[in-house]
Every structure is written in structure tokens, then in C-alpha cells.
Amino acid sequence: MHRVSRALVVASVLAGVALGSPSVHAQAKGAPVNSSFAPVPAPILQGKKAFISFELGDVSSFPSTYSGGPERAYNEFYQGMQQWGRYQLVADPKDADVIFAIRFVDSPGLSHPQIRLGIMDPHGAIALWGFAEEINAAVRKKNRDASFSATITQVVSDVQQLLATGGGPAQP
């Protein structure tokens, strides 16, 4: 009996230490685990003109799961970037300082569909950065559509935050 009590005390102390540790609290609050930042590539920070590329992703989810067509992610991302106004959006990748390639992904191996954004250097087709955001599941189509749009908004916000933390201006 004394052994069981001692084991409970030790377990309680260890649990208290683990729960009281700042890293556990930071993770529980959604704070980033990696607090150090690598430099953001110069074309992203210094670029003035951007081309938005539509990468054809998985089309089987349209129109049954989500409204619109396969180009929905492109259209909503383009609109979000245009409203932000940080980059002048150009129609030809040759005129761009940076390329944003947007794609909807709904592969069988994923637990949730994703919106993926690749940021590339147009001169060397080198990947500079990328984001992947999951689309929250919903039962009703109107809620799935709202979740889709919220995910696109989050991707635009990801780009804004990247520029803000990378030393570049968040606004022109």
C-alpha cells in the first residue's frame, strides 16, 4: 500500500512539472514551437510584382463537396491578395518578382483537404517558401464552403505574417 501511495505522489509531481512547464503551456495556447526565424528569401520581401498561378489540384470534390469549380482556390486567393495590395498582381509570370502557386488538395491519404501555396522565384523556378492549411470538416455544404473560404483567408494571412516577421513591410 505504501508503494502505491509513493508511486501516486511521484506521478503527481511529474505531471505537475510537465503541466507547469512553459513549453507545454505555449503549445497548448497555440504558440509556435519554433521561436527562432530563418531569414525570408529576398524576392518575397523585396518583390513588388507577383504572378498568381493556378495549379490544378484534385477536382473530384467539385461541385459535390464544395461550391464552385477547381479554380475556386485561385479566384479567392487572387481576390485576397488584390485586397491586401502589397504586391502589384501581373498577368504574365515574366513580369513578376515572385510567383504564388495556389492549389486545392484532397488526397485519400489526408485526414482533411488542404489549400497549399508555393512561393517561387520566377527566374529560376526555385521554391522559396510554402504553406499548407487544412480545411475544417463540416457536414453541411454551406458550412464546408465557409470553411474553404476561411482557409483561403488564412493562407493570405500566412503570407502577410511571413512578410511581417521577415523584416519586410506588412503594408506598402
Protein language model regions, located:
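Bacterial N-terminal signal peptides that target proteins for export
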Residues: 1-12
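A generic structural signal for short, solvent-exposed coil/turn residues
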Residues: 11, 18, 42-44, 81, ...
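C-terminal segment of classical bacterial N-terminal signal peptides
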Residues: 15-25
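C-terminal/domain-edge helix-coil "capping" segments
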Residues: 26-50, 77, 122-172
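Surface-exposed short loop/turn segments
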Residues: 28, 82-88, 93-146
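Glycine- and small hydrophobic-rich membrane-insertion segments that are intrinsically disordered
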Residues: 28-32, 55-72, 110-111, 147-154
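N-terminal segment of the mature soluble domain
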Residues: 46-101
